[in-house]
A protein has these predicted regions:
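N-terminal Rossmann-like or analogous alpha/beta NTP/dinucleotide-binding catalytic cores
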Residues: 1-122, 217-229
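Residue-level signal for inorganic ion chemistry
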Residues: 27, 58, 98, 102, ...
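Glycine-rich phosphate/pyrophosphate-binding loops
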Residues: 32-44, 193-206, 227-241, 452-455, ...
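Conserved phosphate-binding loops in nucleotide/dinucleotide-binding enzymes
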Residues: 81-85, 183-184, 202-214, 241-273, ...
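Active-site cores that bind ATP or allylic diphosphates and position pyrophosphate for catalysis
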Residues: 97, 105-236, 242-248, 256, ...
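Structural motif
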Residues: 260-268, 304-310, 343-352, 427-435
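Small-residue-rich helix-loop
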Residues: 327-429
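Charged substrate- and nucleic-acid-binding regions of tRNA-handling and nucleotidyl-transfer enzymes
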Residues: 416-477
Length: 479
């Protein structure tokens, strides 16, 4: 049985877009599920869109997310070079061969002539003008050094038919296709040509890419057939949408992998969520490690319908991953965000991390969740009103001085001791402990929702700061 070989072939034009990451992930999962190889190829034929440093970002994004490729520019392999700009001679060799086979031809048309083909609706389709040049005329113009491109010779009529492993039988009228350029005037190949040559020479068995290539695939098949090569199997993936009407777009700066990492999403969670954008595992399992995905991956679970990117679901999933981290691992992940916050250098960061663990969905929200630690913010006294705990401003005004007195008597300001001591004091007083802790929380944080309860926060703040904040809140209540 033929060994499965898939590839991810991104253009180095910026950050790793989530759509590209999903293509890489599915290509990786399909190859590894079937005991095959996953190859990285850099498609840098469009030099005008090349972004410095983008290739290194591709390497780091793939390796950082666990998608380890078996062959590629930086790891080598038997089918290199794996960068298209280093394969120009190969493309020219096959372009000339395709011309000999009648599948392509030289085109010398000027920019002005091409523009004259534009109709009243702004559409332009090449009219095969140079297809009819004699061999002698072509050789004369080449010898004279005239600029040229090489175009594919698409049949003027008939229907192309091929099978896609997701969408089934695809039919495209040749009349709807244009004699697209294969080799540009600067000598560089276009994607339409290079991907066919490379996929064949690199032994790619399954081509996995987005549905935007469904209508272009007949052009590629014409070249496979002209060369007498076996066509690869095609797996086209559904579009990822930003919302009901707009696609996620790399060109417009939408969701990229590095942005989410910087926001504080764990790479494992991002990969897990991206896997679900178009694929539903059996039993509707949502949380999976990469090895589990490899084991479960099946084309049967891939949808034909577009999927909508939902950052709230990513946040939920990321929160699940954060809660599974050990205390030390969470601290290591949280530390860069704690160091950027106002608490740095003033409080015990390990205690803050312990307070936050399991109470954040992504690490980037840490600074805003702890800004109250530095100083008590001004707050609305209506926060003391709580039916469940039977408190209001008047109850707080009466009870807070007693809470302060109780705290003054306590030397051990650890969470456990504070909780036990205050619960006993509340019982002796004949009030609900919930009332005591609610009033205390508002008084020392100015917030109804905090990462941690009143006694956890008091331990973090320490006795002196806790009592100072209670004094400040008493001042608010007695104005």
């Amino acid at each position: 049985m033929e060994k499965v070989r898939t590839r991810f072939a991104p253009s180095p034009t910026g950050f790793m877009h989530l759509g590209g990451l999903r293509t890489a992930l599915y290509a990786y999962l399909y190859a590894k599920h079937n005991g095959g190889d996953f190859i990285l190829r850099i498609e840098d034929t469009d030099q005008q869109r090349y972004v410095e440093g983008a290739v290194e970002l591709i390497y780091s994004s793939l390796k950082g997310s666990g998608l380890i490729y078996d062959e590629g520019p930086d790891v080598g392999g038997n089918y290199g070079p794996y960068v298209q700009s280093e394969r120009k001679e190969i493309y020219h060799k096959y372009a000339k061969k395709l011309i000999e086979l009648g599948g392509a031809y030289y085109c010398f048309c000027s920019k002005e002539r091409l523009e004259s083909l534009t109709d009243e609706n702004g559409n332009r389709k090449y009219d095969k003008h140079c297809l009819h040049l004699s061999k002698e005329e072509v050789e004369r113009r080449l010898a004279a050094g005239e600029p040229y491109v090489i175009r594919q010779n698409i049949p003027s009529e008939g229907v192309s038919e091929y099978e896609d492993m997701i969408y089934g039988t695809i039919r495209v009228d040749y009349a709807d296709l244009e004699d697209n350029i294969l080799i540009k005037s600067d000598g560089m190949p276009t994607y339409n040509f290079a991907n066919v040559i490379d996929d064949h020479l690199m032994g790619i068995t399954h081509v996995i890419r987005g549905t935007e290539y469904l209508s272009s695939t007949p052009k590629y098949n014409l070249m496979y057939d002209a060369f007498g090569w076996e066509r690869p199997k095609y797996i086209h993936l559904p579009t990822i949408m930003k919302d009901a009407t707009r696609k996620l777009s790399k060109r417009y700066g939408d969701a990229n992998f590095d942005d989410f990492v910087k926001k504080g999403y764990l790479k494992e969670a991002i990969i897990n969520y991206v896997a679900l954008l178009g694929w539903t595992p059996k039993d509707n399992i949502e949380k999976m490690t990469l090895p589990e995905m490899v084991k479960m991956f099946s084309l049967d679970g891939i949808s034909k319908s577009p999927s909508i990117f939902d950052e709230m679901k990513l946040r939920w999933l990321n929160g699940e991953y954060i809660r599974e981290l050990s205390e030390d691992d969470f601290y290591a992940h949280a530390l860069p965000y704690l160091e950027k916050s106002a608490v740095y250098g003033k409080f015990d960061l390990k205690k803050i991390a312990k307070l936050l663990h399991g109470r954040v969905e992504f690490l980037g929200e840490i600074p805003e969740k702890i800004d109250w630690i530095v100083s008590l913010p001004e707050y609305d006294l209506a926060l003391f009103d709580n039916k469940k705990n039977k408190t209001d401003r008047e109850v707080a005004k009466a009870l807070l001085p007693e809470i302060k007195a109780w705290l003054e008597e306590i030397d051990d300001f650890s969470n456990d001791n504070l909780f036990t001591a205050l619960s006993e004091k509340a019982k002796e007083k004949g009030v609900k402990s919930g009332s005591v802790f609610w009033i205390m929380r508002i008084a020392i944080t100015g917030m109804a929702v905090t990462p941690g309860g009143a006694t956890e926060i008091a331990e973090l703040l320490g006795k002196t700061e806790t009592l100072a904040r209670i004094d400040k809140s008493l001042g608010y209540l007695t104005k």
